[in-house]
């Protein structure tokens, strides 16, 4: 069984969100008597070379993808070759293959509702909000839905693009501050973005949460030790790893498989 990650081009470190999921996958494969081969691949147009090792595996678990519009042809290629694979990521109706993912829209909605319940009314969103990054986009749509229900808009000036790194979060928050548009809360599309934003706000002399509340998404270990500890949306990495392995093994056995969406959970800490 080959596990395979495609990190974003400018992120040389493994996203800590995937480390806990990797532990769950490792335990689940061991229980089933499978060996786990981990391969790190960069996005390229050479599909033959990229997937050469997959022929030696019973199946593939895919983690990470960067720009989905560039990544999707890889999935089409796997389907065409008859490879058994399951992917962690956005669950889309027209997507090739089988996917396991979190309920990103509901998670974005829940954390935004929490901020609104605290009296926040000018909520910014840090993270890409396009189909190129569908998980972030779903989180944005949940944020947008909560604002619309509260009869508040989601002005474009309060959305700043960012990939899932601390440095991107720092830059996005600095950009937000420089725009001069009032905001009293930040919904970050990932914890790494949120942690970078915390650093940028502190660097700008803005107190969290007295002046601005900050919330993330993922509940990585660093979220609880951030300063202040980060309110976030927990993705169930233990269940995710189990479902990825279970689904792939059913596929290998020739049994029918379907996409699965895993519920998220709001985790309230001191940042919001």
Residue ranges and their predicted role:
Residues 7-19, 38-47, 66, 100-110, ...:
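Hinge/beta->alpha junction and helix N-cap segments in small-molecule ligand-binding domains
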Residues 24-28, 77, 138-150, 196-204:
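Alpha-helical structural signal in soluble globular domains
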Residues 1-113, 178, 192:
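Alpha-helical recognition/docking segments in bacterial nutrient-uptake
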Residues 112-123:
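Glycine-rich phosphate/diphosphate-binding loops that line cofactor/substrate pockets in enzymes
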Residues 34-35, 84, 121, 153, ...:
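Residue-level detector of anion-binding/catalytic polar loops
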Residues 1, 58-65, 124-126, 159, ...:
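Periplasmic-binding protein-like
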Residues 170, 174-272:
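Flexible loop/turn connectors
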């Amino acid at each position: 069984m080959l596990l395979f990650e495609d990190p974003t081009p400018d992120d040389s470190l493994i996203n800590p969100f995937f480390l806990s999921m990797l532990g769950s996958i490792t335990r689940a494969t061991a229980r089933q008597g499978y060996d786990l081969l981990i391969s790190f691949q960069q996005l390229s147009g050479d599909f033959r070379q990229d997937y050469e090792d997959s022929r030696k595996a019973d199946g593939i678990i895919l983690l990470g993808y960067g720009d989905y519009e560039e990544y999707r042809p890889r999935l089409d290629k796997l389907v065409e070759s008859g490879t058994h694979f399951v992917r962690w990521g956005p669950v889309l109706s027209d997507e090739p293959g089988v996917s396991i993912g979190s309920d990103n829209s509901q998670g974005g909605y829940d954390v935004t509702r929490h901020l609104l319940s605290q009296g926040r009314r000018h909520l910014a969103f840090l993270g890409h909000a396009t189909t190129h990054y569908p998980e972030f986009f779903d989180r944005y749509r949940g944020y947008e839905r909560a604002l619309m229900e509260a009869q508040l808009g989601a002005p474009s000036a309060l959305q700043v693009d960012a990939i899932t790194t601390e440095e991107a979060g720092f830059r996005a928050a600095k950009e937000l501050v420089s725009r001069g548009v009032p905001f009293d809360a930040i919904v970050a599309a990932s914890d790494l973005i949120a942690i970078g934003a915390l650093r940028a706000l502190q660097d700008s002399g803005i107190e969290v949460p007295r002046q601005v509340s900050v919330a993330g998404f993922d509940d990585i270990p660093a979220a609880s030790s951030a300063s202040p500890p980060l309110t976030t949306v927990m993705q169930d990495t233990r269940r995710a790893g189990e479902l990825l392995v279970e689904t792939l093994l059913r596929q290998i056995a020739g049994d029918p498989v379907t996409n699965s969406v895993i519920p998220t959970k709001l985790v309230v800490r001191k940042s919001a």
